[in-house]
Curated annotation (Swiss-Prot):
Its EC number is 1.97.1.12. It holds the Pfam family PsaA_PsaB. The chain crosses the membrane at residues 46-69, 135-158, 175-199, 273-291, 336-359, 375-401, 423-445, 525-543, 583-604, 651-673, 715-735. GO terms for molecular function: 4 iron, 4 sulfur cluster binding; chlorophyll binding; electron transfer activity; magnesium ion binding; oxidoreductase activity. Divinyl chlorophyll a B3 binds at M670, Y678. InterPro entries: PSI_PsaA/B (IPR001280), PSI_PsaA/B_CS (IPR020586), PSI_PsaA/B_sf (IPR036408), PSI_PsaB (IPR006244). This is Photosystem I P700 chlorophyll a apoprotein A2. It is found in: Cellular thylakoid membrane. It is a multi-pass membrane protein. It comes from Prochlorococcus marinus (strain MIT 9312). Coiled coil: none annotated.
Length: 742
């Protein structure tokens, strides 16, 4: 038996070429393809990896806590969170000369330091942390937690503690556990922390390990809870002139429904946040008691899905609704790829919403005034959402190749989707062309007339429908008089009749960037449709890749070729680029394109509002040269001056990263615009030269060098393209924002 890598594939381990190494790495996590893998073993291995994942997260969190406690300035930040720039960690670098050492000695530090743009300081401050000692304690706790979950991962691989396949496939038990215990209890536990620690700290009352059992979070204690007088917990909220972190203007309420932002911290009211978490927690605990499990009460998922059926005797829609769902329960419950696809899609949407809401409804005290952090967090979460969404479709496609059973799904809703794929794909194609030609056409028209000195001839379209939606939520500036912007509407009367004070109208109608609905005009209308083009094109490529995964008119037996194949054999020209993997690979370029437009839009619009110069976005955002000149070029200028012959400033590391990001990005094209034959010939030439150079022959190789496969080379190209893209734009966002606002 071969002992070479990879041990999980003995056939590959005996491959005499370097293909062994690259294919081994490529399939290391494709547990399904490993030698001797059974379904039960597969589930057990995956379950164990979850604990490893949790350990990595815990160690990462511990590292952040430890370095800030050791090298940061958290206690100074607590004293003045709007002016003290948070320090991520110190820098030790032997290359640092006097100039850069001086430039990077910032934020009151004694030596070179990195500034934190993660928002962690604001989060720790908001949840009631105040000292470095507390950060150290949290770091130690997270390190212990990491060890504990690593042990749990190892334990669940031992014969006595391996869960059975039946346990993994008990969908109802799994749903109940995740809903009630993981979501429900954790939300209620977090409410407990907010009520017992964070809210008292925000009112100047310290709660620690020494007194947390003796300090009542509310003067009335639990009496209102047991007497069902829950409204007592909402009475006497913090006043509008409360100073965050002190007793000045503080109330006693713990669960409120105030809406809007705390006037001083410019974040959501902590008592509103606590109310949100207790409500969510209760909803999830109830949801986790809905499915039939140990006691035989509750819903069966199989019965629920199969009742969605026009042939069902109790169908209330008399055959007009609910195509057969027979087989859907088995299909989802037996396919890890289907489940992963659903999970990734859900998480992708949630992550994108987090990006939006961190800016529109900031929940951490004073974070809204840290413009660089806000820009970094928005960009970070939108990029993550993009990766998750593409991953969702990738695993959807793998499901169709590996797990889909036409017999189980005969004539059900999934089979109907496959059966109508031509209509779905062609409609998406039509939408992308309509969006692309019209949006680009208007942009280019506007460029031409501006270039020829007639800016008044631009086509400028007011987004009236979007403005109406904003007005319906209470935005007054458009004069639409709809729902909440109409003082006589039933919505306004209902809102005004609610007891107590409420501040969401103040938030919506703010004049600064903190308004939850920023004013919009023709520039927003155009970029909105550009983003819609990116979304629909990415979706088109992904959906086509998944729905065509099993076969097409061109390649009817595609499912037998697998998820990733370069071409359909040497005898069939014109079949390259047709595997589902290729569709996901091609979609990544559009996804990166799209997410750049999304983040460009958010960043430029906010930069102009923060600078008090919104007219720049409104006027320059209606034509392409305006975007290139007044957003990209203008905001790159500080960056490219991070270092020059006359010296350096604190932006120089970002300037270098900006340059390096371009290099990594451009390197991607070397792999993307070449095929395997070129590299194979080059390698053979280098081998020839090596063998004819006496001194070089002192070094040999066990594996015969061969070029990467077509698919692997594409992956290498895409990886460089993606990482370069992110390095470049990340450096641009942070440097262009911090260069203006610190």
């Amino acid at each position: 038996m071969a002992t070479k890598f990879p041990s999980f594939n003995q056939g590959l381990a005996q491959d005499p070429t370097t293909r062994r190494i690259w294919y081994g790495i490529a399939t290391a996590h494709d547990f399904e393809s490993h030698d001797g893998m059974t379904e039960e073993k597969l589930y057990q291995k995956l379950f164990s990896t979850h604990f490893g994942h949790l350990a990595i997260i815990a160690l990462w969190v511990a590292g952040n806590l430890f370095h800030v406690a050791w090298q940061g300035n958290f206690e100074q930040f607590v004293l003045d969170p709007t002016h003290v720039r948070p320090i991520a960690h110190a820098i030790w670098d032997p290359h640092f000369g006097e100039g850069i050492t001086e430039a990077m000695t910032q934020a009151g530090a004694n030596g070179p330091v990195n500034i934190a743009y993660s928002g962690l300081y604001h989060w720790w401050y908001t949840i009631g942390m105040r000292t470095n000692e507390q950060l150290f304690q949290a770091s130690i706790f997270m390190s212990i937690l990491a060890c504990w979950v690593l042990f749990a991962g190892w334990l669940h691989l031992q014969p006595k503690f391996r869960p059975t396949l039946a346990w993994f496939k008990n969908a109802e038990a799994q749903l109940n556990h995740h809903l009630s215990v993981l979501f429900g209890f954790s939300s209620i536990a977090w409410t407990g922390h907010l009520v017992h620690v964070a809210i008292p700290e925000s009112r100047g009352q310290h709660v620690g390990w020494d007194n947390w059992l003796t300090v009542l979070p509310h003067p009335a204690g639990l009496a209102p809870f047991f007497t069902l007088n829950w409204g007592a917990y909402a009475q006497n909220p913090d006043s509008l002139d409360q100073v965050f972190g002190t007793a000045e203007g503080a109330g006693t309420a713990i669960f409120t429904f105030l809406g809007g932002l705390h006037p001083q911290s410019e974040a959501l009211w902590l008592t509103d946040i606590a109310h949100h978490h207790i409500a969510i927690g209760c909803v999830f605990v109830i949801a986790g008691h809905m499915y039939r499990n140990t006691f035989g009460i509750g819903h069966s998922l199989k019965e629920i899905t199969e009742a969605h059926n026009t042939r069902h005797p109790n169908d209330p829609h008399k055959g007009s609704f609910g195509i057969s769902h027979d087989g859907i329960y088995e299909t989802v419950n037996n396919s890890l790829h289907f489940q992963l696809g659903l999970a990734l899609a859900s998480l992708g949407v949630a992550t994108s919403l987090v990006a939006q809401h961190m800016g529109a409804l900031p929940s951490y005290a004073f974070i809204a005034r840290d413009y660089t952090t806000q820009s970094a967090l928005y960009t970070h979460h939108q990029y993550i959402a993009m990766f998750l969404m593409v991953g969702a479709f990738a695993h959807g496609a793998i499901f169709f190749v590996r797990d889909y059973d036409p017999e189980v799904n005969k004539d059900n809703v999934l089979a109907r989707v496959l059966g109508t794929k031509e209509a779905l794909i062609s409609h998406l194609s039509w939408v992308t062309m309509l969006l692309g030609f019209h949006t680009l056409g208007i942009y280019v028209h506007n460029d031409v007339v501006v270039a020829f000195g007639n800016p008044e001839k631009q086509i400028l379209i007011e987004p009236v429908f979007a403005q109406f939606v904003q007005a319906a939520q209470g935005k007054m500036m458009y004069g639409f008089d709809a729902l909440l912007s109409d003082p006589t509407s039933s919505a306004t009367i209902a809102a005004n009749s609610m007891p107590g004070n409420h501040y969401w109208m103040d938030l919506i109608n703010r004049q600064d960037a903190l308004s939850s609905f920023l004013p919009i005009g023709p520039a927003d209308f155009l970029v909105h449709h550009a983003i819609a083009l990116g979304l629909h094109t990415t979706a088109l490529i992904l959906i086509k890749g998944a729905l065509d995964a099993r076969g097409t008119k061109l390649i009817p037996d595609k499912k037998d070729l697998g998820y990733a194949f370069p071409c359909d054999g040497p005898g069939r020209g014109g079949t390259c680029d047709s595997s589902s993997w290729d569709a996901m690979y091609l979609a990544m370029f559009w996804a990166l394109n799209l997410i750049a437009w999304v983040t460009f839009y958010w960043h430029w619009k906010h930069l102009t509002i923060w600078q008090g110069n919104m007219a720049q976005f409104n006027e320059s955002g209606t034509y392409l040269m305006g975007w290139f000149r007044d957003y990209l070029w203008l905001n790159s200028s500080q960056l490219i001056n991070g270092y020059n012959p006359f010296g350096v400033n604190s932006l120089s590391p970002w300037a270098w990263m900006f340059l390096f990001g371009h290099l990594v990005w451009a390197t991607g094209f070397m792999f993307l615009i070449s095929w395997r034959g070129y590299w194979q010939e080059l390698i053979e030439t280098l081998v020839w030269a090596h063998q004819r150079t006496p001194i070089a022959n002192l070094v040999g190789w066990r594996d015969k060098p061969v070029a990467l496969s077509i698919v692997q080379a594409r992956l290498v190209g895409l990886a460089h393209f993606t990482i370069g893209n992110i390095l470049t734009f990340g450096a641009f966002v942070i440097a262009s924002t911090s260069g203006k606002f610190g």
